[in-house]
Every structure is written in C-alpha cells, then in structure tokens.
Amino acid sequence: MSAILSADDLNDFISPGVACIKPPAENVNRDTNNENGEVDIQIDNEGNPIEISRLDGTATSLSAAQISLADCLACSGCITSAEEILVAQHSHNELIKALKEKVQNKTDKVFVASISHQSRASLATAYNLTVEEVDRLLINLFINQMGFSYIVGTSLGRKLSLIYESQNIISKKEEKFEGPTLSSICPGWVLYAEKTHPYVLPRISDVKSPQQITGCLLKTLTARDLNTTRDNIYHLSIMPCFDKKLESARPEKGEPESAPNDVDCVLTAKELITLLDEHSDDFSLFPPQVESILSASLVSTTELYTKCAPKNWPFVDLSWSNDNGSSSGGYAYHYIKLAQEHLILKDPSTYQPENFTLKTISGRNSDIYELRLIYKDATVASAAIVNGFRNIQNLVRKLKPSTKQTSTVKANPLASRRRARLASKTDGTASSNNATQDTADASKCDYVEIMACPNGCINGGGQINPPADVPEKEWLTKASENYTNIPSYDLLSAGSNGNMLSELIEWCQEFCKEFDLNQNRLLKTWFHEVEQSTDPNAILLGAKW
C-alpha cells in the first residue's frame, strides 16, 4: 500500500488482497522458438534476474513483469484496487515525465486538464481560500507555468451524466423494472460489485461518470480546435478518489486495446500538493504575482474560464458551476426533480406542480437517507443515498436473489409470526404506504446513489488531510461548505431556447452527429463479472498475511 493512500484515510476501508493473481502477460518480443533450450534462473551480482542457457551458458537479462491498470480491472485479487499500481502508473511523477519528454523531444504533444468540484473544494479548504480563488490559481498553474493548452471544470460532463442517468431510471420505472437501479459513478463501488457481488451488475446503471464524459468531450473538441489527433492529447484529470485512476483505464466497448483513453492520468488533490512540494523550483500555486492573479478587477473569472477552454467549448457560463443535491454530484436529487418534471409534462391534467412535496427520510446512520417525491399522499418516485462500504454491504445483502429451500427444516414459529407482522406492515399499495414510512430503505427505492467513501465524494481518499490540530469533522464541514458555495446551475432553469435541460440534450445530439460519434461512446460504459481465480498458488498466497 502506498504512503499516499492508506487505510487511515477511510474509516471503513476494505483492505486489498495480498496476492495479485493476474498472470504476467507473455512478452511478445521474445523468441517463441526458445533457442536457448532449457534454462536456469539466477540472480547476478547486482541482484538482477538472468536466464542461463543449459546449452551454451548464454545469459539473458529478464525484465520485470508489468501490471497495468487494465489488468487490475480484470483481476479478483483485490476487492477494490491495487494502490501501488495506481500510484505508479497514474502519479505526479508520470505527469512530470510526460511534460519533460515533450520539451526534450520537441514534440507537439498537447496537454489539457479537467478538475472536479470536490478537488477544488478540498484545495480551497487547505489554503483557506474561496473556490473561485483556487480556480484562478489553478488556471495560472496549468496554463502559464506547466504549458497546458486548456483546463476546464467537469460541470458539463456532470450535467450530461445527471440528465441521462435520470432518463435511464425513468425509462426503467415505466418498463416496470423490479427493484432499484444502482449508480455507477463511484468506481470503488463498481469494482467491489464486479469482484464480489456480480448478481447486482444487472442493476448497475451504464451511464458514464463526469470524468469520462468530460474526457471524451475535451479530447474531441481539443483535437478539432488545435488540428491534432486524439492520441496526441494528454488529458490530466484531478479527482477526489484514487479509484478514479482505474476508471480511466476501463476499455471502451468495441474499441481496440490500442485506442487512446479519454483520460491519460488521474491525480488527486493530495497528489497535486505533493507535486508542488517536490517541484517547488519549477511550479507554485502562489507565484510572486499572486495578487494580480486573484484580482478579478483585471480579468473576471468568467473571462478566465472562457480563455482557458477550447474555443468551441459550449456553455462556458456553467462549465465550472455546481449542482444541487449531495456532495457526490446530486444524482439522487436530480432523478427526483427530473421525475417530477417528466410526470408534469407527460400528464399535465393529473399532475400539478403545487401538489408535489419532497420528503427526506433518515436511515440508520448519517450515511443513509432517502428522498421521496410525494404527490398528494402517494410516493411517485424515490431515491436513496448510501455512502460507505458498511452500508453498501448491507444493501447488496438485501438485493441478493433468494434461493428456494430444498431441505425440510422445521420452521421456527416465532420467526414466522415476526415475519408475518413485518409483512402486514408493508403489504398493500406501495405508493401510499411508502409515503408514511419513517425509515429509509434503499432496497425498495427506484434509484440508489452509491459512494464507497463515508460522507461521499467530498470525503474521498484523495482529498487533502487536515492538519494535526484540526479535528477531522471540522475539516470535512469546511470542505462541504466550500463545495456548497460553488454557484449552482439548475438544469430546469430557463435557457435561451427553453430550459437548460433541453438545450444540453440538443447540444449533445448535435455534438455526436457533427463528430460522427455514437452516443453510447460518449455516454455509456459496461461492466462484467470478474471471475475468482482457480490458481491454488494464488489463493494460498492471498490467504497469508
């Protein structure tokens, strides 16, 4: 486990497996005829492995087996991720290496960046600044010091993700999909499901996260703007979570393995600080001209947002804006609001806006709660927020398919009567009863917004830790306040041609048409069960501590 990411960062962290069971890939450059015949493996005087031919004594150096992020996605050795691989392949050192290679080799490599809302809030908390001030400093850092061509917020990608996620759930609800649809925005949760609870995969939404949608948009628009190719663009994404590194390596369905990723490197706010500390002679968040950088009287923040984005980047006024709801993006909240809008538009004679109410139902702890959209006395839509692995485990257990009992075990009469009493309380019309229940039950909702970190993405493992003299709760509260203070932009607010919702949908369709891009390539991902290893040696090693 890396020094940057440790179990101390999360209070209900699930430790990774000891053994990585992914077999090393065959070296395609080696001679498949094995001209050396039988060989012995030895260690030379410098500690390097060498291969000695028994035929003529020829010594051949052996290279270390390499494990990629794509390998981690296909490996069941760890429950969520292998941190050493994450940090090694998506590290600030790799970014610095890429920047130096551009200068040394005099290439025309293009560097672009996107940054999440939570990371901006974390940096603002660490430096006691406003998020707007942090934005101005980051733009100066990446554009003026590091030589990036563009930097954007992830708001456009997030808003498209929110829209199509909500539409997906509404469609499933109308198709009588049984049980909740589960969000896929958190890669830690998704990897956990793929490797340990594959029976929930049919429930997981296939709508991409803001990181991946932003990556596709940014590379596509940058390529046209600068007359270059996608594989000549290096996209850095600043995220609150280390598992976002693995998400960036998930291959696109139907594309060759050699196809360039939409995101080339993911760094957390914590890693960005490490980069600045280690390369303080080259880069600084607070250069000598910091006062002029922070002064909005010279250049407004909106002008800065426009200048640092590709020329054809749309909706610049909302590209760094926030969204209502939870600090993980507000997915549950937006489903409820768009479900209400859908009902009103679909049947205006039945549903009047003034008769809707939104009720929040608390769960067993602060990391579980439910949002219910009530029309008069009936629940017409529901969504839950479930944060933290402990709560996730409880949810997936409830969603596990029941198996018919084949043995003739005598039933416990007390247990039977207790189940009967519980059933009598929940029988009847779900709509009317759900409106009056006062305990959140995510397993019975239309949709569940799931995040692996307690308190959601604002408390991601890659966020900056508090100083020793500041309580964690106080630090998290301040970060949450900074996040909330980012100006939000309601999807249902008025736009130039109707509301922002319809304008975004229309723009997305035109974007895909203009670039001959299948909409699924932009918006959809895929998941699959990661089968457990049958290699007894790997299983044995993984059982040892």
Curated annotation (Swiss-Prot):
Signal peptide: none annotated. Residues 426-438 have a biased composition (Polar residues). Keywords: 4Fe-4S, Iron, Iron-sulfur, Metal-binding. [4Fe-4S] cluster 1 binds at C20, C72, C75, C78. Transmembrane segments: none annotated. It comes from the Eukaryota. One of its GO terms (molecular function) is 4 iron, 4 sulfur cluster binding. [4Fe-4S] cluster 2 binds at C186, C241, C453, C457. Residues 401-438 are annotated as: Disordered. GO terms for cellular component: cytosol; membrane. It holds the Pfam family Fe_hyd_lg_C. GO terms for biological process: iron-sulfur cluster assembly. Belongs to the NARF family. Component of the cytosolic Fe/S protein assembly machinery. Required for maturation of extramitochondrial Fe/S proteins. May play a role in the transfer of pre-assembled Fe/S clusters to target apoproteins. This is Cytosolic Fe-S cluster assembly factor NAR1. It comes from Debaryomyces hansenii (strain ATCC 36239 / CBS 767 / BCRC 21394 / JCM 1990 / NBRC 0083 / IGC 2968).
